[in-house]
Regions:
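Amphipathic alpha-helical segments in well-structured domains
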Residues: 65-70
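Catalytic helix-loop patch of NAD(P)-dependent Rossmann-fold dehydrogenases
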Residues: 1-56, 63-64
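C-terminal substrate-binding subdomain of Rossmann-fold SDR/epimerase-dehydratase oxidoreductases
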Residues: 11, 39, 76-224
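Glycine-rich, flexible loop segments associated with nucleotide phosphate handling
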Residues: 45-51, 58, 108, 116-121
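Conserved active-site helix of classical SDR/Rossmann-fold NAD(P)-dependent CH-OH oxidoreductases
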Residues: 27-34, 73, 101, 132
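A short beta-to-alpha transition loop/helix N-cap that caps and shapes the active-site region
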Residues: 1-3, 61, 130-131, 158
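Conserved sequence/active-site signature of Rossmann-fold short-chain dehydrogenase/reductase
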Residues: 57-59, 99
């Protein structure tokens, strides 16, 4: 069954750990950063460290193996069905530009007020979706045939529910995501589709410009 932290979302001050090596390695990294900060870079000295934890990011440029979007793109490009190993697993999906904006906001705040912004920070979406939701959106945006369930009986353990609580970033930095799942997947599909004939650098520049305009529009709407 899901723990209370999983249901409400993992916070920055929750105990570190993990059932599987992958999540345990994330916790170990945070513990190492925290100990280094306390030992050598206390905020009162004017220099310190903050760590950032993003949700499950998607976006163009990822070609790694055993990752959801790249595996699906490779299959769709070959005319196959998009594979889903754990369609019911819930993750905090977000476009890669969302946490990157948060990292820049955190870096700026840390530079001006080290003591106020040291520590760990979560940058996750306001809503979570299943693997199946993401794959179905991708198939629709890519104009492909469909998806298929491809279970791996010998696969390592993975948590079925992962949620991030980003209240701290929202309240102290004014950060929040501006893209919903559909728009995030659409941008991702568009990047992979266009790289067949266009420069990846050109697509990234155009995507970034579009994202900046979306952020500005969102900010203007909140002022009304």
């Amino acid at each position: 069954s899901a723990t209370r932290a999983q249901l409400r979302g993992c916070r920055e001050d929750d105990p570190m750990g993990g059932h599987d090596p992958y999540s345990s390695s994330k916790g170990a990294c945070e513990i190492a950063i925290s100990s280094w900060r306390r030992s050598f870079l206390p905020p009162e000295n004017g220099r310190t460290i903050a760590s950032a934890r993003a949700g499950n990011v998607i976006g163009g440029g990822d070609w790694a193996k055993d990752r959801l979007i790249p595996d699906c793109i490779r299959a769709l490009e070959k005319g196959r069905l998009a594979p889903m190993r754990n369609p019911g697993s819930v993750r905090p999906w977000q476009h890669v530009l969302e946490p990157l904006r948060g990292y820049l906001m955190l870096a700026k705040a840390l530079w001006h007020a080290p003591a106020d912004y040291a520590g760990g920070w979560n940058f996750g979406p306001g809503s979570v979706h299943t693997v199946g939701d993401v794959v179905n959106c991708l198939v629709e945006e890519y104009g492909a045939a469909g998806s298929e369930y491809t279970p791996e009986n010998a696969a390592p353990h993975e948590a079925g529910l992962l949620v991030l609580d980003s209240t701290k970033a929202r309240e102290k930095l004014g950060w929040k995501t501006v893209l919903d799942l559909r728009r995030s997947v659409a941008l991702t599909a568009d990047w992979y589709r266009r790289t067949r004939t266009e420069s990846a650098a050109k697509i990234c520049r155009e995507e970034l410009a579009e994202y900046i305009q979306i952020c500005k529009k969102q900010t203007d709407m909140e002022k009304i």
